[in-house]
């Protein structure tokens, strides 16, 4: 297999996890162990630009969005601990806090996030190139630690611009729909309550209640109750039509009708009571219908009530 494709078979795709990069690849690198397949190359970070890594760190023939390499940490000062990450065109700047990488048992390393800036520090132009730098957890009694790190470089997807384009299209559609409603709707500026409310009632007009008609059917047990209610039927309908109430007073202009007590059962629906108000006295008299009293006496004898 030629070295142009990284020595991997066709269709090979390299997507290691953080734990695999630290526990397998970087640990073997600092221990000088041999890899069965050389897929991660050594790169001098100070001598290569991020856009040149696409050709230098290519693995196989399949398209890649991430590029991996080993790099030896270069001290910015001989006696200091700061790492030099400057290139010819710019520099890598650390951002945020380092993330601790753990396996199922313990802490195995750290991950540092860096962003590439064009120009010279402290003034530089931020780019979309991001790098994750992995290092083994520093220990004083580890003789194999040789300053090696493994890096993953990728270009940040510009989802924000795409989202803005989509959002702008949606907002434009909403604005067009709103303008169409303003042009076409005859109910602009009218609330839902005003659209659905009934016609306004004047001060001196009282709403007429609907005609109350008895909906129950008389019990067919040998006695026809409709004959007994015939004399009261016309009087029942007339009583349910008030002629009006004077505004500002509590006096009824005319006589109100019969209070229908059909809330309990069918056998009580035929019972009624009549209230009369002479317009001057505040007390009302109750007159039970004579026909119903006679019916109650007969039905009581039959055991119906």
UniProtKB/Swiss-Prot annotation:
Q: Which UniProt keywords apply?
A: Activator, Developmental protein, DNA-binding, Nucleus, Transcription, Transcription regulation
Question: What tissues is it present in?
Answer: Expressed in the root cap, in both columella (COL) and COL-adjoining lateral root cap (LRC) cells. Also present at low levels expression in the tips of cotyledons and the cotyledon vasculature, as weel as in vasculature of the first pair of true leaves and at the hydathodes.
Q: Name the DNA-binding stretches.
A: 108-162
Q: What subcellular locations does the record give?
A: Nucleus
Please provide, alphabetically and separated by semicolons, the GO molecular function terms listed in this UniProt record. DNA-binding transcription factor activity; sequence-specific DNA binding
Recorded GO CC terms: nucleus
Query: GO biological process: any one?
Result: plant-type secondary cell wall biogenesis
Matching entries from Pfam families are given as: NAM
User: What are the NAC domain coordinates in residue numbering?
Assistant: 8-156
The UniProt entry lists the main location of this chain as nucleus
Entry superkingdom: Eukaryota
Disulphide linkage map: none
What is this protein for, i.e. what is its function? Transcription activator. Together with SMB and BRN2, regulates cellular maturation of root cap. Promotes the expression of genes involved in secondary cell walls (SCW) biosynthesis.
Note what the entry says on domains.
The NAC domain includes a DNA-binding domain and a dimerization domain.
Instruction: Tell me what this protein is called.
Output: Protein BEARSKIN1
Q: What is this protein's gene name?
A: BRN1
């Amino acid at each position: 297999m030629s070295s142009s494709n990284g020595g991997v078979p066709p269709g090979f795709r390299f997507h290691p996890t953080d734990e695999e990069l630290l526990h397998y690849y970087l640990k073997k690198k600092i221990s000088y162990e041999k890899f069965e397949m050389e897929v991660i190359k050594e790169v001098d970070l100070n001598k290569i630009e991020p856009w040149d890594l696409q050709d230098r760190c290519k693995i196989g023939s399949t398209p890649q969005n991430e590029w991996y390499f080993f790099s030896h940490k270069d001290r910015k000062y001989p006696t200091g601990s700061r790492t030099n990450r400057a290139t010819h065109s710019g520099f890598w700047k650390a951002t945020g806090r380092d993330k601790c990488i753990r396996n199922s048992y313990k802490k195995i390393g750290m991950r540092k996030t860096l962003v590439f800036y064009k120009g010279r520090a402290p003034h530089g132009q931020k780019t979309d190139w991001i790098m994750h730098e992995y290092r083994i957890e520093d220990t004083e009694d580890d003789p194999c630690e040789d300053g090696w790190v493994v890096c993953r470089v990728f270009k940040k997807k510009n989802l924000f611009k795409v989202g803005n384009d989509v959002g702008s299209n949606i907002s434009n559609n909403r604005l067009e729909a709103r303008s169409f409603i303003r042009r076409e709707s005859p109910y602009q500026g009218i609330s839902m309550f005003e659209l659905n409310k009934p016609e306004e009632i004047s001060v001196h007009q009282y709403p007429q209640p609907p005609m109350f008609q008895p909906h129950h059917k008389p019990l067919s047990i040998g006695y026809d109750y409709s004959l007994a209610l015939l004399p009261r039927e016309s009087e029942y309908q007339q009583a349910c039509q008030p002629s009006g109430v004077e505004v500002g007073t509590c006096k009824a202009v005319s006589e109100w009708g019969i209070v229908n007590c059909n809330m309990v059962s069918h056998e009580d629906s035929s019972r009624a009571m009549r209230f009369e108000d002479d317009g001057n006295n505040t007390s009302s008299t109750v007159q039970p219908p004579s026909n119903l009293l006679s019916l109650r006496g007969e039905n009581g004898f039959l055991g119906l009530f």
